[in-house]
Amino acid sequence: VTMFEGDTVRVYSTFANPNVFGEYLLLLIPVTAALFLTEKKSKYRRALWGVSLILSAASVVFTQSRGCWVGIIVAAALFITFYEGRVWTAAPLLVLALFLVMPDTVFTRLSSIGNTSDTSTAYRIYIWLGTLDMLKYYFLGGVGLGEGAFGIAYPYFSYSGIDAPHSHSTYLQLVSDGGIPALLAFSALTLSFFKNVTFSYGVGGKRSFYSVMSLALGAGMLGFAVEGFFDYTFYNYRVAAIFFLYVGFSSAIRHMTGGGQDE
């Protein structure tokens, strides 16, 4: 646990950084929700998934990570829409309930998104601007892989007093590491992932295990992609590992549902 801007508590578990912990949870929560919703055989396992889901959701709130909050909102919106879209008819009541139960610090943090007078927001914007200036010269092949290469090139383009180990954006960091080809390769991998989960969704009925899990994977990946605009989501190897597990699971589920037979 750490303190942020006065008396605001931010949790980070074993990840040393609240944003990294939030990204980890952002990928786990949709899958946990799918396991909870599809568990029909054991009430104990269902209860376990339910408790895990509640604790994970609470932990995301206390990371105070605005990018992860936006990612979770996007992931939840996609999941709810395709799992049970009728829930949106009760949206006003849900919003009211959130206002009643959420701490004021959550709404204060959310309202600061895009506010350049906020220290954290301004810090990121200046890093992005410095990185973009750098990439004007290195967009074809990047500056090299890793923090070491970034740390050598970035200071020549950084704004005064704005030091950073990375670009605080997955997409800018990909171009920094390997240029436009790296960004294109990542885009192709992501599109392949969404192709897999789109195929698997609805196989065996929209409430089948494979369908719900494919929906959860797609929702989690979309939320993760949104968070990638605000931070470098592959900075921690554990988060990166879960991303590639997502990709592997999407391919495995498509194969098990018959999608690999004509490829």
Language model features: what each stretch is:
Residues 13, 17-19, 57-59, 129-132, ...:
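A conserved mid-to-late transmembrane alpha helix and its immediate loop/hinge
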Residues 199-211:
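Membrane-interfacial, low-structure loops and terminal tails that flank and connect transmembrane helices
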Residues 2, 6, 16-19, 64, ...:
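Residues at secondary-structure transition points
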Residues 93, 206, 215-263:
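Transmembrane alpha-helices of multi-pass inner-membrane enzymes
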Residues 1-7, 13-82, 90-97, 101, ...:
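Alpha-helical transmembrane segments of multi-pass inner-membrane proteins
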Residues 5-9, 106, 114-129, 133, ...:
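Long extracytoplasmic/lumenal interhelical loops at the membrane interface
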Residues 35, 90-91, 109-110, 141-144, ...:
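Short, hydrophobic secondary-structure boundary micro-motifs
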Residues 60-63, 79-119, 129-137, 145:
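A membrane-periplasm/extracellular boundary helix in multi-pass inner-membrane enzymes
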